Amino acid sequence: MNNSSELIAVINGFRNSGRFCDINIVINDERINAHRLILSGASEYFSILFSNNFIDSNEYEVNLSHLDYQSVNDLIDYIYGIPLSLTNDNVKYILSTADFLQIGSAITECEKYILKNLCSRNCIDFYIYADKYNNKKIESASFNTILRNILRLINDENFKYLTEESMIKILSDDMLNIKNEDFAPLILIKWLESTQQSCTVELLRCLRISLLSPQVIKSLYSHQLVSSIYECITFLNNIAFLDESFPRYHSIELISIGISNSHDKISINCYNHKKNTWEMISSRRYRCSFAVAVLDNIIYMMGGYDQSPYRSSKVIAYNTCTNSWIYDIPELKYPRSNCGGLADDEYIYCIGGIRDQDSSLTSSIDRWKPSKPYWQKYAKMREPKCDMGVAMLNGLIYVIGGIVKGDTCTDALESLSEDGWMKHQRLPIKMSNMSTIVHDGKIYISGGYNNSSVVNVISNLVLSYNPIYDEWTKLSSLNIPRINPALWSAHNKLYVGGGISDDVRTNTSETYDKEKDCWTLDNGHVLPRNYIMYKCEPIKHKYPLEKTQYTNDFLKYLESFIGS
């Protein structure tokens, strides 16, 4: 004999013939012959049992009638070199028995089998099992499978076996795979109906109430399993006082607009949360130095340069709902580049920039309402400028920094309302080409150029502006200085990505930790190589149901959108 497999085969032959066997495993009326030494080498349970005088050395039987005979027999066969034959039907019993007998290699093999075969058909069953036996590895994996397949599972026969504690955990999770928060109450109601359990305030608190449509809130009010509970109605009567909720990960899509390394085309990329990668969903011919604004899930790109040396007045758009380009949009009043783009609930705004005729700066702000045949003059800034930060907050247009006459940066901060322009606290330093975002009631800016005279110092500064106190706060700096990066807010976090650093396109991204006031490089949002990200926008999924009138069977109507 020259290998262990031959030795194991010989020892198993001894067992089958009863040779040298010194212990019998008794399970009800069944007996399994074995050797103490072999069992002790494979099982911590048997090792302790046989070595610490738990049974007399002359005792030839161990009673394990509380265990499943077939599982014990399969595991002892496994100890003697016979592979486990695992199925979805027996793996739970074998794993539970292996865990009791503390057979580590069998436990690992069963766990691998379950993790490999987890799917929507068995995830609830395995989740309930793992929760009962405190197997954190399987519990976590099966729970994540439930989150991914939740809308498929609400009609599963096992859905009713989930406990209220489990439902609270599911409905509270940011990764719940719903594209609109209105589906969360549907999940809750389907579970209540399947269990015939009355609703609780704890379950209602799991919903992102501020994101629900009026139709779904009415559906909650009118459902018997909710309306019959006084505490639930009291809670729903006070939802106006609840804090603003943040969308779940899958209820928005991160869409980036930039220039790809493939023939320098405009590239529209979508972030794949499952793969943690950016995937290009569309592209078109080259353009740069354009402004971007988003209205009704349509991304508008205004002005800039195309493949000619001249600035453009063309406006194109990408519809994220239909995944199609729109070209029949009225042109700007004149060609311009390096301008700012904004949108409110009705209009697209094109702000400042450089005019084509003589490369002069412009102060004009034009706006366009979709369906209108032309752009109209709206206002003028106090001074011509380009490459400034722009933001829409509380109905006001804010213009931040920028490049003014003489190719110098400015530190001005001004806002435009119906009453005209208002000056605010100046920036701590003169800046341009920074990224801007509104988050949690404040304006954040990052990167760009800074300094007072020559525009040539790439910045890693991050600042926030509080409009209530009219003050700027300096936050922790970026790890990588960058100009024209994209700054975005998603899931109550700030991210910055892309841009140009040291004259080279950077594909790095960073995430801001508010509690620690620090930026960390974010490997999950790394951009494609040589990709300049102009802007990143969280796009909220929209459904036709949002314009539907309420009816008594509205939740059934909502259910018809599952899978669309």
Swiss-Prot record:
PROSITE patterns: BTB
Entry-linked Pfam families: BACK, BTB, Kelch_1
Gene Ontology annotations of biological process type: symbiont-mediated perturbation of host ubiquitin-like protein modification
The keyword Repeat appears for this protein: yes
InterPro entries registered for this protein in UniProt: BACK, BTB/POZ_dom, Kelch-typ_b-propeller, Kelch_1, SKP1/BTB/POZ_sf, Vaccinia_A55R
Domain BACK span(s) in chain numbering: 123-219
Summary of the function given for this chain in its UniProt record: Probable substrate-specific adapter of CUL3-containing E3 ubiquitin-protein ligases which mediate the ubiquitination and subsequent proteasomal degradation of host target proteins.
Protein name: Kelch repeat and BTB domain-containing protein 1
Gene that encodes the chain: KBTB1
